[in-house]
């Protein structure tokens, strides 16, 4: 009876002791992140680094409308196809839009030499000045400038020709040698285009140019080429058996371009002084331009985001996130989200000893739960929480700043003869893309691992801070909790939390209570030992008596014979 009373006394004393627990925040978040060692770790807070949403529209870029070519393409716009006349007045744009129906290009059949390279050049041009490089009325007095029209380039039901070129033919059965130069005084690159006509027969050659053995020479400091017309019978295209070859070059500021010819020259009338801009580009999409504004445009739609990565489209124009193949890039900022009713699973408790977080602590990441005669409650440790928030915020901002080098990525142009180069280029681009995706994913995995370890370390440091103050004035009872050997009111609890706990003040009370509890435990242990001895002896006597009774019964009925020899 005495033992039972002592045990009850010990239990009663333990139940009414004041306690202080170290813990961490938990909430109802379902955000998951990946680390180097784990996948789909639920965390209290995280930030998404990957943009996967767009508006599905073509928008203005930085408030500037794009140049929508409609049924025209780049060639038609630059040569001045009569069907593209409405586009001639547009001098600036944010980017260029072609459609799958942009068929109005070279109306007179022929080849546009290095057309893909010209498109690539224009992908970095945001505006140009269209100016008359060789005035029509004064530049060619000895040649006919109005007869060079064709049914292949109709306008308003009549034969016409490109608005930016002049098809020179003979005048009064004479085509004297021409020589004309232009000096670039625009202070910027000037794009100049011209053409060479290839008649189908010698008769056509003489009818148009009089000279049977004509030539064309075009030269500048960087471009020098002599052309000879290729007279040959060809199948008709757009009603024409002849062909034209279209050429272009860029004239640097201060440079001179010279045209010399005895026939077959389609001379430039207008040229283009170009202003380059890194945010321009060419998009092929059938959508119209909407009344919206964006900083980043893709062929799938506009992106308005400050995130460093996107997985929408590799071709972008404007201030755009980097394209990666990833489907998820989420960076942890908070702790592992493990409410106390759940198990931590394979990797155990946070900080190695606390089994669950507190949903009741909402004003910080780390903190305390106390219980004493005045009540109980949660309180966040503001200093450690704020230090952690500042550190993680700076880290996230640094990662985003380093990775958020916004740029324009345009598709590269290749013609059908350069298919092998195009395929090789795609392989190289895919290789770089794979490497960039791997680097981005690895960065996030490593930073998530460091963040979660950082939180674990902060909780453990907070626990050690409390333990170093309390020393033997309290005992560790597991799961991050301390049980005081003395009464600890709210003022006492607050002193522990803010690091001003007065250990000597409570040492004597703690010593007495500790010795009393230890004495109760010792007395209880001795009584249990005596009871165990008595129980063992009694059990042995009962066993011996039982064996004797069985033996006597068996001897009496003959089942067991006993012989005593002397």
Curated annotation (Swiss-Prot):
Source taxon at top rank: Viruses
Record topological domains on the Cytoplasmic side: 551-566
GO MF term set: host cell surface receptor binding
Signal peptide per UniProt: 1-17
GO cellular component, one term: membrane
Bilayer-crossing regions: 530-550
The UniProt record lists the keyword DNA damage: no
GO biological process, one term: virion attachment to host cell
Subunit structure: Homotrimer of disulfide-linked HA1-HA2. Interacts with human CACNA1C.
Family membership: Belongs to the influenza viruses hemagglutinin family.
Protein name: Hemagglutinin
Species the sequence originates in: Influenza A virus (strain A/Swine/New Jersey/11/1976 H1N1)
């Amino acid at each position: 009876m005495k033992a039972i009373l002592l045990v009850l006394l010990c239990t009663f004393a333990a139940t009414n002791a004041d306690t202080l627990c170290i813990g961490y925040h938990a909430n109802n978040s379902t955000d998951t992140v990946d680390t180097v060692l784990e996948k789909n770790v639920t965390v209290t807070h995280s930030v998404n680094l990957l943009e996967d949403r767009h508006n599905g529209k073509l928008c203005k870029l930085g408030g500037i409308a794009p140049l929508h070519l409609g049924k025209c393409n780049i060639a038609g716009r630059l040569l001045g196809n009569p069907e593209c006349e409405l586009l001639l007045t547009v001098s600036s744009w944010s980017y260029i839009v072609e459609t799958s129906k942009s068929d109005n290009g070279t109306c007179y059949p022929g080849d546009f030499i290095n057309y893909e390279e010209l498109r690539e050049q224009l992908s970095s041009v945001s505006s140009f000045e269209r100016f008359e490089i060789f005035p029509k009325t004064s530049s060619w007095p000895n040649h006919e400038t109005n007869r060079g029209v064709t049914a292949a380039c109709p306008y308003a039901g009549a034969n016409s020709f490109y608005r930016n070129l002049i098809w020179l033919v003979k005048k009064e059965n004479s085509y004297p040698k021409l020589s004309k130069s232009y000096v670039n005084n625009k202070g910027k690159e000037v794009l100049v285009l011209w053409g060479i006509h290839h008649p189908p027969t010698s008769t056509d050659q003489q009818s148009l140019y009089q000279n049977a053995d004509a030539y064309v020479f075009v030269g500048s400091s960087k471009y020098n080429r002599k052309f000879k017309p290729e007279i040959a019978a060809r199948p008709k295209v757009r009603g024409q058996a002849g062909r034209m070859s279209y050429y272009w070059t860029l004239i640097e500021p201060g440079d001179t371009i010279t045209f010399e010819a005895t026939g077959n020259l389609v001379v430039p009338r207008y040229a283009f002084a170009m202003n380059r801009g890194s945010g321009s580009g060419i998009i092929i999409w059938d959508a119209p331009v909407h009344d919206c504004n964006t900083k980043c445009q893709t062929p799938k739609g506009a992106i308005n985001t400050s995130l460093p990565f996107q997985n929408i489209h590799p071709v972008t124009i404007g201030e755009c996130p980097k394209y990666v193949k990833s489907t998820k890039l989420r960076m942890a900022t908070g702790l592992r989200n493990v409410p106390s009713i759940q198990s931590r699973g394979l990797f155990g408790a946070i900080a190695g000893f606390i089994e669950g977080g507190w949903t009741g602590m909402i004003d910080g990441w780390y903190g305390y739960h106390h219980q004493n005669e005045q009540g109980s409650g949660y309180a966040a440790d503001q200093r450690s929480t704020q230090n952690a928030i500042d550190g993680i915020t700076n880290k996230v901002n640094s990662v985003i700043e380093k990775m958020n080098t916004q740029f324009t990525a345009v598709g590269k142009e290749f013609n059908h003869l350069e298919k092998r180069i195009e395929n090789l280029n795609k392989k190289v681009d895919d290789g770089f893309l794979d490497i960039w995706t791997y680097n981005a994913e690895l960065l996030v995995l490593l930073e998530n691992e460091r963040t979660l370890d950082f939180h674990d370390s902060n909780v453990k440091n907070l626990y050690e801070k409390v333990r170093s103050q309390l020393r033997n004035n309290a005992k560790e009872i597991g799961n991050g909790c301390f049980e005081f050997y003395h009464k600890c009111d709210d003022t006492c609890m607050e002193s522990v939390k803010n690091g001003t706990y007065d250990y000597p003040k409570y040492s004597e009370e703690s010593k007495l209570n500790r010795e009393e509890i230890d004495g109760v435990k010792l007395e209880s242990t001795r009584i249990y030992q005596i009871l165990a001895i008595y129980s063992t002896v009694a059990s042995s006597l009962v066993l011996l008596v039982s064996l004797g009774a069985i033996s006597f019964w068996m001897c009496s009925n003959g089942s067991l014979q006993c012989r005593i020899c002397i």
